[in-house]
Structure formats: C-alpha cells, structure tokens
Amino acid sequence: MIVKLNYVFIKKLIFFQLCFFIFFTSPLYSELLKNKKFPDSNKFLNVNVGLSTLSAPKYEGSSKSVSRIMPFFDLKYKNITFNPVMGLNVNFLDNQDWLLGYGLGFNFGRDPESDVNLNGLKKVNSTFEPKLKAKYKTKYYSITSEISYDLLKRGHKGAYLKTSFNTGFPLIKLKTFIIPSFSFTYADKIYLNNFFGVDDRENLSSGYSKYNLESGIKNISASLMVIYNLNDRISINSNLIYKKLVGHVANSPLVSKSDGISTIFSIVYKY
C-alpha cells in the first residue's frame, strides 16, 4: 500500500525527529537514568488515583471534538498493571534490554447513532482485545510493538499492529519530565473496512459511495507528555497527541478530517 503524506507533514516529522535526537543524547537525560530518578518505581505495589480531562475527535475521521472529565486510576502489582484505558497487562519478561507482555484491553467500537455523519452505516460493536507486546529498551530510547485483535469476533473482527518510538528527559531540577513519542498503526483489511469502508448495503442506506480498503498503515501520530512532580505524592500530567490518517484510509468518504489533536490533563496522587 502506498502511503501519501503531504510535504508539510513530512517536514514537521523531520524537524521533530531532529529535536528529539538532540535530547536523546543529552548528558542530562543520561544522568537521569544513572540516578534512577525517572518517574517509575520498583515497589511491588503502586497505586495512582486522580482526575483527568480529555478532549478528542468524536471518532477517527470526525471534524467534531468531545470533552470529558473522568477519574484516573492506575494499579501496578509486581509484573501486573491495570488502568481503565490500557486494560490489564502482565509482563512475563522484563530485563535490561527487553520487555514482553500480554494484556487484555477493550475497544468501544462505533455507534452510527452518535453522529449524523454516520447515519446509515452499520454498528461496530464493542469487544475485548488481547494484546501481545514486545519492547526493546536502550539507554536513550525504547521501541514498542503491540498487536491487538478482536477476541469475540463481534466487533471490528480484525487485527492491528501499533509500533512506537519513545524517549524521555528531565527539566527543571529533575522535577519535570518530557516524554515524546512517534507511532504508526498497521491494520488488516477487515479492521479497516469495518471502520472506514462502505459496502453495498451501506451505499444504499447512507448515500456514501462504495469504498473498499486493503491492509495497510492506518495512521501516524506524535505525542508529547509532560509530567510535573509537585512533591513525592502529587504530580500534574499533560499529554498532547497529534494523529493523522494516511493513504486509502484518509481518502475514505467517511473521513471528514484526516488529522486531529487530542489533549489529556490529569492531577495524580501516588500512594
């Protein structure tokens, strides 16, 4: 599948990659890892609670945004982690270079009654998604790949692979942490057609032109997370995420806007 990116977007990616490469090799970040002051803990039990505000596109490809206020909860016990967004994860290998894990998440699907632009389209039911994750870790960055699929075969019925490139570095006397990342998602044609395709029935009921997709890259995204530690217990977290649908996905008649920005702001208390 040929992915077409506009020239401006490519320039932005190159610029961000150059900036992040400078930070990857900074002595400050190296000192952070050496002193183990990154916001992570080796305790057997970690519990974080708080409150978050979220603003995001109504659905992928929507030109409208929705905002929500929701509680924040994150639990880690030994090699097991759980939070409502990422689901349940178990790491069965975690050493200096590699992390391998298995998890169970939830996909909310898509309700055609939630937006007038989806009228006449079939409903994509919510479903559970098993996830197999592999992470390669170095001193300055990590690369993570995670494959997910529809466990119940009652939702999108497909599978997708997300690969992320992450790093992190401190600012302001190691109290503020900057965590940038890049990622792309590759999905099979079953997943893509359920969310972005238009079949014969939908063509008649919705008025959208028939549209069929093959397996390929669904989106490219960049995010920037900032964590500010007020003290040993309380932190303020913010996350800015830019996502762009690409290739045949971006050309789907169901896509009103191919790119979008999501923001998350949280106040977290660490037990």
Spans of features found by a protein language model:
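Outer-membrane beta-barrel transmembrane domain signature
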Residues: 91, 156-237, 243-249, 254, ...
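Short sequence motifs at beta-strands and strand-loop junctions characteristic
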Residues: 41, 63-65, 82, 122-126, ...
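Extracellular loop and loop/strand-boundary signature of outer-membrane beta-barrel proteins
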Residues: 57-59, 116-120, 148-153, 207-212, ...
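Cleavable N-terminal export/targeting peptides
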Residues: 1-43
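Outer-membrane beta-barrel "beta-signal"
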Residues: 70-74, 165, 258-271
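Transmembrane beta-barrel strands of outer-membrane/channel proteins
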Residues: 49-55, 86, 102-108, 145-149, ...
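Short glycine/proline- and aromatic-enriched beta-strand/turn motifs that initiate or cap beta-hairpins
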Residues: 30-83, 88
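Repeated loop/turn-to-beta-strand initiation elements of outer-membrane beta-barrel proteins
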Residues: 47, 79-82, 98, 140-144, ...
